[in-house]
Design a protein with these regions (language model features):
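Domain-edge interaction signal
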Residues: 1-100
């Protein structure tokens, strides 16, 4: 079952020490989605659809959630986002992406 977009975004932001910008988050989310799909027969990590924008892939719902922060750091604006259990295999992909 795919995770909620906000849950993955919160996990990545938190794992990155809340230092990522909108542009960085979009790219990390895209990488996580593509890596996860590649390893899991096309099953998505999270529900969402990316679009090709001038500066790279963008998930519009996520963009509108964090666009007010411009190129600055995104604080914890993901209310209602669920966490991931320690043994959740989706964490491996998100952890790997955050190391890049």
């Amino acid at each position: 079952m795919a995770a909620r977009l906000e849950s993955v975004a919160k996990y990545i932001c938190k794992k990155s020490g809340w230092t990522v910008s909108n542009l960085q988050l979009q790219k990390l989310m895209y990488l996580a989605q593509m890596i996860y799909m590649g390893r899991n027969n096309g099953k998505p990590l999270f529900d969402g659809t990316f679009q090709a924008w001038d500066y790279g892939p963008v998930e519009p719902n996520l963009y509108h959630t964090v666009k007010g922060y411009g190129s600055g750091r995104i604080p914890d604006v993901f209310s209602g986002a669920l966490g991931f259990e320690e043994d959740d295999p989706r964490r491996k992909v998100m952890d790997d992406v955050c190391k890049r």
